Amino acid sequence: MIIIIPTIVIVTLVLILLLGKIIMRFNFRKQVKVLYENTENISGQHYDSSKLNDLPEPVQRYFRSVLKDGQSYISSVHLKHNGLFKTDLEKGFIKITGEQYFSVLLPQFIWKGTTLMFTAIDRYITDQGSLKVYLFDLFKVVDGKGSAINEGELQRWMAESVWFPTNLLPSNMVKWTTIDANSAKLSFSYKEISFHFLVTFNAIGEITTMQTERYMTDKKRETWICKMSNYKEVNGIRIPFSAEVIWRLSTGDHSYANFEVQKIEYNKY
């Protein structure tokens, strides 16, 4: 038996889906506006390699590799990427596109990841983190928030600082400690949240991995690893254009995100 769906039903469904996309776009832009309203312009500060001498040797190597003397500090970032993503470690990869905004002096970001069926909004704005996932831009299926989410979002912001490396320079939030010739400890502290990363570097100074312990559930942390590669120069700054994100569990390493940067802009308001 052939089932014929009335044209009015099809048109109604299309209009509902279109409305969902319009509402999603509007809400995303509204949150970006809040992020920018809380962004302070620090581009008047400039990188000076002569101030690196007290840092661990591989960290000095990194900054000399990715920054040039006189480089303006980065205040804000707008980034677009494509890639592959897993909604569950037991499932296969699906295609994803992403758009993301960062502020630097105040830790903030918002990311919108879009797949064929789902849209995810991951954010940390005005000291509040959240992860929300929508089916067809309309039906909320995930609504994560709380202290574990707040910490995880700040860890994401810190790891993704490789895309705006002046944020990795020593500050009241960021400290570096020596480990060995090719690794260092990055300690981060902001208000009541503190954590550290084990950061590894290659021979030419590029950061290749950042590893920390991150909440995988509300109650349990697991090893979380970001791998960076394919460094290219943008506006005099060398950044990785390829990133892979992995959970290291008792069952082994589980890759769940592979992103390729398509566009990045600095200090645009």
Short names for language-model regions:
Residues 28-78:
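N-terminal leader/targeting segments and the immediate start of mature chains
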Residues 59, 63, 97-100, 128-133, ...:
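Buried hydrophobic residues that stabilize the cores of well-folded domains
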Residues 60-140:
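N-terminal mature ectodomain segment of secretory-pathway/periplasmic proteins
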Residues 74-80, 104-111, 179-187, 208-209, ...:
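Short, hydrophobic/aromatic-rich segments at coil-to-beta transitions
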Residues 99-103, 122-124, 173-179, 199, ...:
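Short, exposed beta-strand/loop patches in secreted or surface proteins that constitute
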Residues 184-266:
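Gly/Pro-enriched, hydrophobic low-complexity segments
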